[in-house]
Amino acid sequence: MERLVATRLVTGLAVKIMRSNGVIHNANITSVNMDRSSVNVEWKEGEANKGKEISFADVISVNPELLDAVLAPTNVKENMPPQRNVSSQNHKRKTISKIPAPKEVAAKNSLLSESGAQSVLRERSTRMTAIHETLPYENEMEAESTPLPIQQNSVQARSRSTKVSIAEEPRLQTRISEIVEESLPSGRNNQGRRKSNIVKEMEKMKNKREEQRAQNYERRMKRAQDYDTSVPNWEFGKMIKEFRATMDCHRISMADPAEEHRICVCVRKRPLNKQELSKKEIDIISVPSKNIVLVHEPKLKVDLTKYLENQAFRFDFSFDETATNEVVYRFTARPLVQSIFEGGKATCFAYGQTGSGKTHTMGGDFSGKSQNVSKGVYAFASRDVFLLLDQPRYKHLDLDVFVTFFEIYNGKVFDLLNKKTKLRVLEDAKQEVQVVGLLEKQVISADDVFKMIEIGSACRTSGQTFANTSSSRSHACLQIILRRGSKLHGKFSLVDLAGNERGVDTASADRITRMEGAEINRSLLALKECIRALGQNKSHTPFRESKLTQILRDSFIGENSRTCMIAMLSPGFNSCEYTLNTLRYADRVKELSPQNAETNDDNLQMEDSGGSHASIEGLQLQDDFLLKDEELSTHNSFQDALNRVGELEDKAVDELRELVQKEPEWTNLLQMTEQPDYDLENFVMQAEYLIQERSKVLIALGDSINSLRLALQVEEQASKQISKKKRSNK
């Protein structure tokens, strides 16, 4: 049966096929393979041509009309195969029909055969004539399908001719003869026409394929022109650009409402700087909405296939590279200014990697090495303080405004408004933290504050890092204090934190760098825990773990305490690790899940940033990384050694200060000898007393110095252990 159906399957025939997903659509037969009982079909999908191989059985199952056409009887006369000998055609015509033709027809046929009918045959029409009264279904099939093989036509013609009823012979005889007369001479031309149509169709399909290939090649060339292949990591840049094309971004603007939070965590992305542009780095950070940040982390599979891992983080507010300092201030620090007039304590932090824009955000715009201090958060807050001070609801309070500006470097406090004098942090009898010797300067306008900012910024400690030749290596804190007489009414602390990338330099060969990294890490961890304790209303706040949190203790304790953190992000490809560390740090401060964020972009593939959210009580280094137990033990040993060094250093400095403070007694003793009638016995007694006291101090100082040296050796060994662990893990 399949062989019979195969006779109807010819090249160019339009059939229906079923895809693997169950979809049925039309396709054209391009070739027939009788040995494998299959056909090759081709169809157009979109702008591409596709094809597949289908068995005869599958074709019959989807196209049952082919089988019906083979089995059904028909009285339609089809075109006869062309023959070279016209007399043989007449013979076949008579034997196939088995119906005696009238004399006129016979005479006509004989006349045609004798008079050289070849020329007449070429002039006849090649149209096909069908008897619609007899088999309308088969006529419809013939009209829809493509021309069939010549052998098939002859076989079907014979089968149909034998089934003509004898009773219908007088009526059909003349009609059949006419059909035979018209079909037989046109057989040669029909065959040529069928072949030419198939060839034309194949050529048309070939031309379409060539055009499609040319179009695809042009697209590839155009796509290659869009990306500079000389740029490092251009493949990642291409993937990021294609991903961003699917996003529906909604940037934050000044028209959006400013929500008030007790703890507000925001993220700001800066644009690529000149150094990154010169290196042709790609931008790996996207801000699709006002509270979502995406990091396109470049990854490599085992087979070195490049792909992106898109990590999503949610915060209260997210600012892209187009946001100005004024926009950032409106949603971060501005809501906190009014709280200090109501007797509250507010704190605003700028956190992030060196070169991410912390000082730019807090201090103001840079033009070369000069800074415009009137365009930073410091200046905006100062203006709003004096604006609120003149309002009637606060004017009757008769408040005075004071400013302090200090820095914390290596756990030590220095006054930036008093020639960088070293300060001591102590607790008084009321268990309130006092910065002994900190200079508070009264100001009467915002311009006075600007001058203080310029003076303090010029004295701030800086150092060189891989990101910046002159990087701030200390935490700078500007405090705007409101006093009503001598009583504290409110305080706003604006803190520009040190770069967090030095927190991983605890294994450096340079002791100063190790100390910097350890102190920065210590203060940042303690700061995070204090903010979390404030947000979760914990009974214990670990503010004693660092000098920074110790000084800002009153900002973490109390119902009127409010905090805002601005996490600064560097978008460059080479800053991906530090950027993720910054985002994880900010995420753990408030722990907002990105899955709960409201966004209109359904195509965002947001993944949980991961990591444990367990609270860290005490000091653990490298909070930005998940450490194994043995690694954590090594870091704890280093931290213990570092704490011991700090304690012994403070002890030795105090003893030395005590020794220097007794220096006037020795001066007085010396001046006694210059008098002509001084009491020698009294001189001896005072000298012996001072020597004994000095001996005690010197012995104690000597012991402290020896202990400090041993502690430094222990710290050195602990640092080497960390270095070995890192090398073994690589």
Curated annotation (Swiss-Prot):
Residues 599-730 form a coiled coil. GO terms for biological process: attachment of mitotic spindle microtubules to kinetochore; cell division; metaphase chromosome alignment; microtubule depolymerization; microtubule-based movement. The lineage of its organism: Eukaryota, Metazoa, Chordata, Craniata, Vertebrata. Promotes ATP-dependent removal of tubulin dimers from microtubules. Regulates the turnover of microtubules at the kinetochore and functions in chromosome segregation during mitosis. May play a role in chromosome congression and may be required for the lateral to end-on conversion of the chromosome-microtubule attachment. PANTHER family: KINESIN-LIKE PROTEIN KIF2C, KINESIN-RELATED PROTEIN 6. Its main location: cytoplasm. Belongs to the TRAFAC class myosin-kinesin ATPase superfamily. Kinesin family. MCAK/KIF2 subfamily. Residues 79-98 are annotated as: Disordered. ATP binds at R268, G352, Q353, T354, G355, S356, G357, K358, T359. It comes from Xenopus laevis (African clawed frog). InterPro entries: KIF2A-like_N, Kinesin-like_fam, Kinesin_motor_CS, Kinesin_motor_dom, Kinesin_motor_dom_sf, P-loop_NTPase. Residues 262-592 form the Kinesin motor domain. One of its GO terms (cellular component) is cytoplasm. It is found in: Cytoplasm, Cytoskeleton; Nucleus; Chromosome, Centromere; Chromosome, Centromere, Kinetochore. Residues 211-242 are annotated as: Negative regulator of microtubule-binding. One of its GO terms (molecular function) is microtubule motor activity. Residues 1-256 are annotated as: Globular. This is Kinesin-like protein KIF2C. Keywords: ATP-binding, Cell cycle, Cell division, Centromere, Chromosome, Chromosome partition, Coiled coil, Cytoplasm, Cytoskeleton, Kinetochore, Microtubule, Mitosis, Nucleotide-binding, Nucleus. It holds the Pfam family KIF2A-like_1st.
